[in-house]
Regions:
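A short, N-terminal amphipathic alpha-helix
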Residues: 34-53
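N-terminal nucleotide-binding beta1-loop-alpha1 segment
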Residues: 1-22
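Conserved alpha/beta core of the MobA/IspD/sugar-nucleotide pyrophosphorylase nucleotidyltransferase superfamily
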Residues: 156-205
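Conserved donor-nucleotide/metal-binding helix-loop-beta segment in metal-dependent transferases, i.e.
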Residues: 104-130
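Short glycine-enriched loops at secondary-structure junctions
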Residues: 10-15, 61, 126-127
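Short phosphate-binding loop-to-helix
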Residues: 67-97, 150-153
Length: 205
């Protein structure tokens, strides 16, 4: 068994108008931010329950009451998303797994990676991106220049791992649209995200 990895979560402070803008409409910016906060809280709770060497929140904005104990908080660097992801890995001195705040359905089982016989983990997303990237020997150069937020992002990032021993994680759906939100909530009905979505949907009727 390899050393426990650092678990990285890259996220934005859930402020109205700054997060989940593709949920508006049908949701207001305030409701979209509430859903983002619930998704982030679920994600951080899962990371907190997953064995790890360190747990690091790479944050744009300020931490709030949604942050559980046990996390280091570092600020995101300026630049494009590829640069910010690369910089997140630069905080690690050993194996690391990075995820975002858009997959509240993640579980400790999904995040419990072991690099004993592989060099990388890759978690593809339904929209063509990726929800997880793990590196046994973090190299920021593997991310720099990858076009982000396009249908090709995942394929380009996966190709960057050529020559490494890669394990693919299950394909997950990011929460980008209201349709995504419904499907994701259905896969994790007991979470904060599903509860908040049900509350907001009922309140809007």
């Amino acid at each position: 068994m390899s050393p426990l990895p650092t678990l990285l979560v890259i996220a934005k402070e859930p402020r109205p108008g700054r997060v989940k803008t593709r949920l508006t409409p049908p949701f207001t910016p305030q409701k979209a931010a509430a859903l983002a906060e619930a998704a982030l809280a679920d994600t951080l709770d899962t990371v907190a329950r997953t064995p790890a060497h360190r747990r690091v929140l790479v944050l744009e904005g300020e931490p709030g009451p949604w942050l559980p104990p046990g996390f280091e908080v570092v600020r995101q660097c300026p630049g494009g998303l590829d640069e910010r992801l690369a910089a997140a890995f630069a905080h690690c001195d050993g194996p690391a797994l990075l995820i975002g705040m858009d997959t509240p359905q993640v579980t400790p089982e999904l995040l419990g990676v072991d690099f004993a016989d592989c060099d990388a983990y890759f978690g593809p997303a339904e929209d063509g991106g990726f929800w997880a990237l793990g590196l046994a020997d973090p190299d920021p150069a593997l991310l720099l220049g990858v076009p982000m937020s396009t249908p090709r992002t995942g394929a380009v990032q996966r190709a960057r791992l050529a020559g490494l021993r890669v394990r693919d994680l299950p394909r997950l759906r990011d929460v980008d649209t209201a349709y995504d939100a419904e499907l994701v909530a259905g896969t994790a009905p007991g979470g904060r995200f599903a509860t908040e979505l049900a509350r907001l949907t009922e309140a809007g009727r």
